[in-house]
Design a protein with these regions (language model features):
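N-terminal signal peptide c-region/cleavage motif recognized by signal peptidases
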Residues: 13-18
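Compact, glycine-rich, soluble single-domain proteins
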Residues: 49, 53-55, 60-106, 110
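Terminal, regulation- and interaction-focused segments at domain boundaries
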Residues: 20-56
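Extracytoplasmic/secreted envelope proteins and their assembly/folding machinery
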Residues: 42-45, 49, 66, 145, ...
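Positively charged n-region of N-terminal signal peptides that target proteins for export
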Residues: 1-4
């Protein structure tokens, strides 16, 4: 089961990027924003984690998929997931749309592509709003976007 989960997460993390704007690269189908990093996966994730802690977020997990893949004798490029949150948006959204729990708490994925380039990816809050159409969620979604943007921008300085 862990092998299937790990492989599925890796496949999802490498979805095609379809649109670029001032906020980064956005895959319009998945709602994932992706930005480049000049650092290694580990260094970038260390900075993402520090930035999340810096705004008072709780760190729930940091998953190193490359390390996990070694346990099943699969060789993958560096790929780490951080699960974090402050608890403001999730309860409201989940109360109104229980399936929103699949997208909460926040997640940031730092990964290396086949060219050795490192990327930071996260879900666009507006996509979450569209997916669940929770009435009155606009302020929560705006907060989600602002918090994640602040964390990623700080990490990529």
């Amino acid at each position: 089961m862990k092998k299937v989960f790990g492989i599925a997460a890796i496949v999802l993390s490498f979805s095609a990027v379809a649109f670029a704007d001032e906020s980064g690269l956005l895959d319009k189908n998945s709602g994932i924003i992706t930005k480049p990093s000049k650092l290694s996966v580990t260094e970038t994730m260390d900075r993402v984690e520090a930035a999340a802690k810096g705004i008072g977020a709780n760190i729930f997990a940091r998953v190193d998929y490359q390390q996990l893949s070694k346990k099943v004798n699969v060789d993958i490029r560096p790929n780490q997931l951080l699960i974090f949150g402050r608890g403001a948006a999730a309860p409201y959204l989940i109360k109104e749309a229980p399936l929103a729990g699949i997208d909460m708490p926040f997640k940031a994925l730092v990964w290396e592509d086949s060219q050795g380039k490192v990327w930071v990816s996260h879900t666009n809050g507006s996509f979450i709003d569209t997916r669940y159409a929770v009435k009155g969620a606009a302020s929560y979604v705006k907060n989600v976007d602002e918090v994640i943007e602040k964390i990623v921008s700080e990490a990529l300085k």
